[in-house]
């Protein structure tokens, strides 16, 4: 029964991982209304595009984390009489989670940076606002430098927090 879902999932994951996010933005906003009765606002199209692409990348993080756990862990859980689901929940996933955090956080940073692409749909996110201000003030150096500093500051704070989390989990892993 899982094979029914595996092939479509692999195709979707491959598609979203191997095409640029801007294509997903444009397709969600301009092409989706042509092939379906849905007409999305720029915000909804941006959310749909980012969600679909991020789901594909996060799925790979989960897959990689679970596959990184040795077969001996599965065998040990089976020897203890655990079902596959119980083994995954109690043995495999807690170990895999520690390994998944760095790529999960990295993808989250990429997701945050990708929100700037929403400006291509005329959605008023940070970069779009900067373009509007620049068109009124004709001060691109100041405007775009400020935006760069804002993104850098936000991501630096998140990055520092993620490093603390990684250190905390690494310490708890060695106990």
Give the label of every model feature segment.
Residues 1-175:
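Transmembrane alpha-helices and adjacent helix-loop boundaries
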